Amino acid sequence: MDLGIKGKVALITGGSRGLGRQSALALAHEGVDVAICGRTEKSLSSTVTEIKKLGVNSLGIIADVTESADIGSLHSEVCESLGAVDILVNNAGGSLSREDIEGTSLEDYKKTFDLNLFGGFELMKLVIPQMKENNWGRIINIASIYGREYGGNISYMSAKAALIAATKHSAISLAKDGILVNSIAPGSIEVPEGSWERFQNENSPDVVEGFISDNLPMGRFGWPEPLGDLVAFLASNRSGLITGSCIVIDGGQSISMI
């Protein structure tokens, strides 16, 4: 299937590894020029090399999405090197604590929002004007099933729920401008150096097997390729009637009916 996005420009935050890397590769397979940002030169360089082997232009930029100055510089460098951003994937995120409300400081709560919500919000504001001018744009925010139902810790759950809400509001606001805005809610997907790999390394086989038995109907952790394929589809011309949606990709893990 030709997704019709060859020659478009994508920016993926947290794109050097994990789900961001898989999203970058999936878009590159469709002929998209891809810029990624991350915090370490080594992982950025490795992923950029992989992307370029697919015959597209690629750029790796060291940036911290919790810093407004980095966000502005990131956007400017992508536009100067590859052109205006057609596809934005806000993938950078994570959890800074494992605590409930009593064990979570306000500082950690704010930092979790900086990482999971505010950085993506700033980038959306930067790319939207050119998308409106082109009457075409795609914004994909990587949330979590724990933004839809109970799970994880209070700061992460709250931030991902806010990201889903911001996605819905933005989608409706921009629907007449040719800009589609959606979120993806992954479940427990295992990637190298990711949280679920750490979970398996830090716990006994009995604990891991118990978690899988209790929570994962497929009997295994998820894998990243389906999410990358979903990102590519949502970024494409084939997704023209999909906006404001939060698409769950969790192998049946969620217990919510909606």
What are these regions (language model features)?
Residues P129, I172-S173, G240:
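Alpha-helical segment proximal to the catalytic Tyr-Lys
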